[in-house]
A protein has these predicted regions:
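Bacterial N-terminal signal peptides that target proteins for export
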Residues: 1-8
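Charge-biased low-complexity segments
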Residues: 19-275
């Protein structure tokens, strides 16, 4: 699916640049938006309906892409007392536009995340002091999102913290991007190791549980950007080195804030679609 979005092109051109030699990096720049909503799943795992939050603020082309593919999704049936059960779940979806030539973009559904609880019901944040924004990044105008994943004991203390991925909203050399990713990841992980979480409501009594917690470093972006394209350079995804953690893909579909327990999500069995 190729769509011309003048606003996307203007945004990609306006992405802050810190280097003269950045051709290969510019080719990797993407624009994306993360949308939230609900999805109704029948007992057999088929989609019986869905709704996107604040749909009037979402580009019609994006809504059309979702309408084309979401109804065809199929999930692993949810079992309750040994019986398949219909369920309304909460979802977040990342739609990505990647430049193809001078005036076209390939638009696709990159990631999706599904949860049985609304974001506000996924536990209380407890003691989660935000990380310090690295001064060097502020001076250089570098912003981005660090997708942290933490392993928590039954007392709510963080046992392990790991940065799965760091996406940056800046153009720079490959070397500089790697340095900025490392700097922001270190800041996020330093804070994450001091966090305290309440008991995971879905797994009382478990010795440990795992959650994804995105950390957004933003300069002057306090406005609501829901339904708007945002340009960034995606970083590589690295799963945590812990054994026994079931991850349904990377963290890219998660909103920029919140606590998202891992291992209790609904499992999508079919491709997401879009290209």
């Amino acid at each position: 699916m190729r769509i011309w979005f003048g606003c996307i092109l203007a945004m990609l051109v306006a992405l802050p640049a810190l280097a003269q030699e950045r051709g290969p990096v510019r080719d990797r720049v993407e624009a994306s938006m993360v949308l939230t909503g609900t999805i109704d799943i029948a007992a057999d795992g088929k989609v019986s309906g869905y709704a996107i939050d604040r749909a009037a603020e979402v580009p019609t082309g994006v809504l059309g892409l979702l309408a084309r593919f979401v109804p065809g999704w199929r999930f692993e049936p949810l079992m309750v007392d040994g019986q398949p059960t219909a369920k309304r779940a909460y979802m977040s979806v990342r739609v990505v536009a990647k430049r193809q030539g001078e005036d076209a973009f390939a638009v696709s559904i990159r990631n999706a995340s599904f949860h049985q609880q609304a974001p506000g019901q996924r536990g209380t944040k407890g003691n989660m002091r935000p990380p310090r924004y690295p001064h060097a990044a502020i001076r250089a105008g570098v912003s981005g999102t660090v997708y942290t994943i933490v392993r928590i004991d039954r007392d709510g203390r963080v046992l392990d913290a790991f940065a799965e991925q760091v996406d940056l909203r800046v153009l720079a050399s490959e070397y500089a991007l790697a340095r900025w990713r490392e700097l922001m990841a270190d800041a996020a992980l330093h804070a994450a190791r001091q966090w305290y979480f309440p008991e995971h409501p879905d797994a009382p009594g478990d010795d440990t549980w795992v959650a994804r917690v995105p950390v957004d470093f933003a300069i002057g972006r306090g406005e609501d950007r829901y339904g708007q394209w945002q340009a960034y350079v995606p970083g590589p995804w690295q799963p945590p080195p812990w054994t026994g953690v079931r991850l349904a893909g990377g963290p890219g579909a998660l909103p920029a804030s919140g606590i998202f327990p891992v291992g209790h999500d609904l499992q999508l069995l079919t491709p997401m679609g879009g290209q």
